[in-house]
Amino acid sequence: MSAVKPLEAVARDRVGKGAARAVRRQGRVPAVIYGGGQSPQSISLDANQTHHLIYGGGFLSTVFEIAVDGRTIRAIPRDYQLDPVKDTPLHVDFLRVVSGQTIEVEVPVHFVNQDAAPGLKQKSGTLNVVLHTITLAVSPDAIPDAVNVDLTGKDIGDTVHVSDLVLPTGASLALAPSETVATLVPPTKLGADVEAEEAAVAEAARAGSAAEAAKEG
């Protein structure tokens, strides 16, 4: 389960493009907390910390305890905007987390026990991943860091479907059970195979050159 993370914020009285630009000049990122049947709360966040949180992974599936004006607001990021040139954060939207509420979050899919998959370990097959993330409808208190797929015993030609995933208690998926998560496919020509093929081509070229030289002689 993802841990709730603390996050310091400063309340903003002014909103709009001009106010947002002024906030960014101060090394901060404008943000808003909305939902939960309450009025939106405009805040600003430290720009460096926000950058690290976004690029650290799992940002949109992490619940934060946001400290502002002497109180804390539990919220989860719903969206963020980046500068198209610098890739720095421009704005963040947070959704208030309400007790008993179910929310949709996107979490990564991790593939475990690959060494125990004969199709990968013994037969040098390739894991063709179709879904790197999945969207869960889950309680904010039960958001997992990832959904693990156990590859033990999987062979070439096997397929992992959405129905094979083990989900947290109370969580559900917005995908069809038959949808493909990953497949194990046969190995392709790599490494030694490519080198052997190149050597054969070079040998054929040398033989051809020798034959031409013999004709001219």
From Swiss-Prot:
GO CC annotation: cytosolic large ribosomal subunit
InterPro entries: Rbsml_bL25/Gln-tRNA_synth_N, Ribosomal_bL25/Gln-tRNA_synth, Ribosomal_bL25_b-dom, Ribosomal_bL25_C, Ribosomal_bL25_long, Ribosomal_L25_dom, Ribosomal_uL5_bac-type
GO biological process terms held by the UniProt record: translation
Pfam families noted in UniProt: Ribosomal_L25p, Ribosomal_TL5_C
Gene Ontology MF: a single term: 5S rRNA binding
Domain of life according to the entry: Bacteria
CDD domains assigned to the protein according to its UniProt record, in alphabetical order: Ribosomal_L25_TL5_CTC (cd00495)
Assigned keywords, A-Z: Ribonucleoprotein, Ribosomal protein, RNA-binding, rRNA-binding
Subunit and interaction comment: Part of the 50S ribosomal subunit; part of the 5S rRNA/L5/L18/L25 subcomplex. Contacts the 5S rRNA. Binds to the 5S rRNA independently of L5 and L18.
Family to which this protein belongs: Belongs to the bacterial ribosomal protein bL25 family. CTC subfamily.
Role summary: This is one of the proteins that binds to the 5S RNA in the ribosome where it forms part of the central protuberance.
Name of protein: Large ribosomal subunit protein bL25
Provenance organism: Methylobacterium sp. (strain 4-46)
